[in-house]
C-alpha cells in the first residue's frame, strides 16, 4: 500500500476547476475553469506554489482544458466558446497569439504531438480536428487544419497523442475510443478500428511511457487497460493489413462508486491515478508478478481529495509521485505519493 500526503491547497479560481497541466520542465503549471481564466503557477522563494499570472482575455466561456507543447514555449486552451487559444511568451509575458476557429460547438480537449508540429482538438460537435503548425523566423506562427475526422457519433471528450509517434487517440460519449494515423502514401489521416469495451461515456485516456498501452476511464465506473499488438505477435492475434491492433487486457471494476472523469499514467513510476465523481482520487499500481497480456493492478491509495467531483489528475513530468488534482470545489491540490512497502 501507499499514501498520498497533501502538500498544498491552492485557491483563486471562481467556480469549478476543470483542468491543470504541468509545464514539461516541471517548474510551472497552468489551471483553468468555469471562470474563463487561466492561472499560471510557480514556486515562490518560500517553496510554496503561487499564481504568477492570470490570463483573462482569451475566452468568453468556460475553459475546459489546457495543454503545453513539448518544447514548453506554447500553451493551448480549449473552451466552450468553440475556440482554441494558443499562448506564448515571445514578448516576455503570456499573450494569445492565435485563436483557432472551426468547431461548431464546445471544444472539450486539446493536445500537442510529441514533435510539436501538430495540435489536435475535439468537440461536442462530434469531430476531431488536426492542425499543423508552421513556424517561420520573425513571423507569426500559422495554424492550418489538415484533417477533420468524423469517426465518433457523439460528443468527443478527450484527445491524446501517443508519447513516441504521431498516433492520436480520442474518447467519446459514444462509449468508444478511436485511433488515427497518417497514411504516409497520401498524407491523409485514417481512422483505425474503434476500441470497444466500455458500456458508457469514455471520459479520458492516457498512454503509458512506452505508448504500448492505453488506460481509459468511463461513466460506467470502470478503468480499462488496452495493449497494442503488432504483426507476428506471440499470442497469434491477427493484425489486418500487417498493422497493429489494440485489445482490452484488463478491467478494473468495483473500485469507483461514480463516474471516473480522468486518468493519468505516471511516466516515471507506472502508477495510475484516477479522478472520480465521488470526490475521491485513487492510485493503482501494477502487481509485481503481473502478466503483460493479462495485467493485474492493485489499489494502493484511496483518498477523499475534494469536497465535490474530482475532475483532473496530473502526475509531475519529472518528480516521481508528485500529483496535481483539481475539482468542482474550486480547489487545486498538490500531493506526494509515498510507497509504504
UniProtKB/Swiss-Prot annotation:
PROSITE patterns: WD_REPEATS_1 (PS00678), WD_REPEATS_2 (PS50082), WD_REPEATS_REGION (PS50294). Keywords: Repeat, WD repeat. It comes from the Eukaryota. Gene3D superfamilies: YVTN repeat-like/Quinoprotein amine dehydrogenase (2.130.10.10). GO terms for cellular component: cytosolic [4Fe-4S] assembly targeting complex. InterPro entries: CIAO1/Cia1 (IPR028608), G-protein_beta_WD-40_rep (IPR020472), WD40/YVTN_repeat-like_dom_sf (IPR015943), WD40_repeat_CS (IPR019775), WD40_repeat_dom_sf (IPR036322), WD40_rpt (IPR001680). GO terms for biological process: iron-sulfur cluster assembly; protein maturation. SUPFAM superfamilies: WD40 repeat-like. WD repeats lie at residues 12-51, 58-97, 102-141, 151-190, 197-236, 255-294, 305-341. Signal peptide: none annotated. Belongs to the WD repeat CIA1 family. Essential component of the cytosolic iron-sulfur (Fe/S) protein assembly machinery. Required for the maturation of extramitochondrial Fe/S proteins. This is Probable cytosolic iron-sulfur protein assembly protein Ciao1.
Amino acid at each position: 500500500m501507499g499514501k498520498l500526503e497533501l502538500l498544498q491547497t491552492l485557491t483563486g479560481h471562481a467556480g469549478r476547476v476543470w483542468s491543470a497541466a504541468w509545464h514539461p520542465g516541471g517548474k510551472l503549471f497552468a489551471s483553468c475553469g468555469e471562470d474563463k481564466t487561466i492561472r499560471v503557477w510557480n514556486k515562490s522563494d518560500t517553496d510554496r506554489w503561487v499564481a504568477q499570472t492570470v490570463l483573462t482575455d482569451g475566452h468568453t466561456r468556460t475553459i475546459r482544458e489546457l495543454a503545453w507543447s513539448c518544447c514548453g514555449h506554447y500553451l493551448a486552451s480549449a473552451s466552450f466558446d468553440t475556440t482554441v487559444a494558443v499562448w506564448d511568451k515571445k514578448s516576455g509575458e503570456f499573450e494569445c497569439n492565435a485563436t483557432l476557429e472551426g468547431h461548431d460547438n464546445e471544444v472539450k480537449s486539446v493536445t500537442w504531438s510529441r514533435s510539436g508540429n501538430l495540435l489536435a482538438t475535439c468537440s461536442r460537435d462530434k469531430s476531431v480536428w488536426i492542425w499543423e503548425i508552421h513556424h517561420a523566423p520573425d513571423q507569426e506562427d500559422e495554424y492550418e487544419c489538415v484533417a477533420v475526422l468524423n469517426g465518433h457519433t457523439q460528443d468527443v471528450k478527450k484527445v491524446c497523442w501517443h508519447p513516441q509517434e504521431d498516433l492520436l487517440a480520442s474518447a467519446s460519449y459514444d462509449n468508444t475510443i478511436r485511433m488515427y494515423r497518417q497514411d504516409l502514401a497520401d498524407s491523409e489521416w485514417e481512422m483505425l478500428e474503434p476500441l470497444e469495451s466500455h458500456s458508457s461515456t469514455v471520459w479520458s485516456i492516457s498512454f503509458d511511457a512506452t505508448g504500448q498501452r492505453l488506460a481509459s476511464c468511463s461513466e460506467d465506473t470502470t478503468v480499462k487497460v488496452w495493449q497494442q499488438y503488432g504483426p507476428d505477435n506471440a499470442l497469434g492475434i491477427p493484425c489486418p493489413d500487417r498493422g497493429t491492433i489494440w485489445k482490452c487486457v484488463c478491467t478494473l471494476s468495483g473500485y469507483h462508486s461514480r463516474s471516473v472523469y480522468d486518468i493519468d499514467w505516471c511516466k516515471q513510476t507506472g502508477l495510475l491515478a484516477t479522478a472520480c465523481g465521488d470526490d475521491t482520487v485513487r492510485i493503482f499500481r501494477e502487481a509485481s508478478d503481473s502478466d503483460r497480456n493479462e495485467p493485474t493492478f492493485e489499489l494502493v491509495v484511496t483518498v477523499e481529495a475534494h469536497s465535490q467531483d474530482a475532475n483532473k489528475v496530473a502526475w509531475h513530468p519529472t518528480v516521481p509521485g508528485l500529483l496535481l488534482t483539481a475539482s468542482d470545489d474550486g480547489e487545486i491540490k498538490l500531493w506526494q505519493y509515498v510507497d509504504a512497502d
